[in-house]
Curated annotation (Swiss-Prot):
Gene Ontology biological-process annotations: L-histidine biosynthetic process
Major enzyme class: lyase
GO molecular function, one term: imidazoleglycerol-phosphate dehydratase activity
SUPFAM superfamilies listed in its UniProt record: Ribosomal protein S5 domain 2-like
Gene symbol of the encoding locus: hisB
E.C. designation(s): 4.2.1.19
Name this protein carries in UniProt: Imidazoleglycerol-phosphate dehydratase
Family to which this protein belongs: Belongs to the imidazoleglycerol-phosphate dehydratase family.
Organism: Magnetococcus marinus (strain ATCC BAA-1437 / JCM 17883 / MC-1)
Catalytic reactions on record: D-erythro-1-(imidazol-4-yl)glycerol 3-phosphate = 3-(imidazol-4-yl)-2-oxopropyl phosphate + H2O
Chief site of localization: cytoplasm
Source organism, top-level taxon: Bacteria
Compartments where found: Cytoplasm
């Protein structure tokens, strides 16, 4: 069964469409109008083994906040739809990913009990023109809408770009592990209560 979903979101602030294939080959076609976010989402696709298409436009004459958050919301909704009832998946995943001097760790549980634990500090307020406080907004929106318990931690690092990118790459690798089908489960939900869809 194909694990593919398309979700759209239109508000007075943004218009977004996301197509996500969890069993892809790492191809990304992303245009959010926010260059650094595009770069990070390309990492999700590449290192998560997903195919990702995103087309977004927003009120960037104000700032990038609405676009970044709403892309996280819509991508999370597409993830939730694509993963389905979560039967037979590994469920848990974690990854440590370095980028030069920076090292980050992400741990996920596809429990359908969304939450974000965020322990990431950036030494600068911006990466280029991108506000570093918006990284948490994207992760929070994606976790909430995707039904993911997510722990994101920067263990150390000096360069804000490297810290952010190592977090996104670690998320990609953790999701790749958690989404993998575990043949030993025989299609059963990996939970003692028998379901992860409620």
């Amino acid at each position: 069964m194909a694990r593919i979903a398309t979700e759209s979101r239109t508000t007075g602030e943004t218009k977004i469409q996301v197509t996500l294939n969890l069993d892809g080959s790492g191809k990304a076609q992303v245009d959010t109008g926010v260059g650094f976010l595009d770069h990070m989402l390309d990492q999700i696709a590449r290192h998560g083994g997903m195919d990702l298409e995103i087309e977004a436009c927003g009120d960037q004459h104000i700032d990038d906040h609405h676009t970044v958050e709403d892309v996280g919301i819509t991508m999370g909704q597409a993830f939730r739809q694509a993963i389905g009832d979560r039967r037979g998946i590994t469920r848990f995943g974690h990854a440590y990913v370095p980028l030069d001097e920076a090292l980050s760790r992400v741990v996920v549980d596809l429990s359908n009990r969304p939450s974000l634990s965020w322990r990431v500090k950036f030494p600068t307020q911006k990466v280029g023109n991108f506000d570093t406080e918006l990284f948490k907004e994207w992760f929070a929106a994606f976790a909430q809408q995707g039904g993911i318990t997510m722990h994101v931690e920067s263990l150390y690092g000096e360069n804000s770009h490297h810290i952010a990118e190592s977090c996104f790459k670690a998320l990609a690798r953790a999701l790749r592990s958690a989404c993998a089908v575990d043949a030993t489960l025989g299609g059963v939900a990996p939970s003692t209560k028998g379901t992860l869809s409620d």
